[in-house]
Amino acid sequence: GNLDARRDWGHARDYVEGMWRILQQETPDDYVLATGETHSVRGFASRAFAAAGIELDWKGEGLAEKGVDAASGEIRVEIDPRYFRPAEVDLLMGDAAKARERLGWTHTRDLDSLVGEMVAADLELLGREGLPRAERMA
């Protein structure tokens, strides 16, 4: 997919807290729960590999761009055109000002802690179950 796409990633625990606060209101209303920060898919991938102890070097451009393990030279990330969205939105970012002002809600976890938690959970699962079935069959 598009490594340049920028997204507003946030932690589910923060969003559940926001939803709970919304449900406590006397009058129903619409709220946006978001971090107000964007990060590229490339940056997310770099953070995820770093959390697993792998530094990526990005080489090439466009469809030929690859994330290469800086230590081993092994290709870790390749672009697959099947994952490009037909109507790609380059930037998705929310404005949670209303939730902050009326609910006192704001996100409390940054992207690095989110990515670290996700990678740790995957590494734990990998340690318990080994490679996913599709990887074993390859």
Regions found by a protein language model. Give the residues of each.
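C-terminal substrate-binding subdomain of Rossmann-fold SDR/epimerase-dehydratase oxidoreductases
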Residues: G1-A138
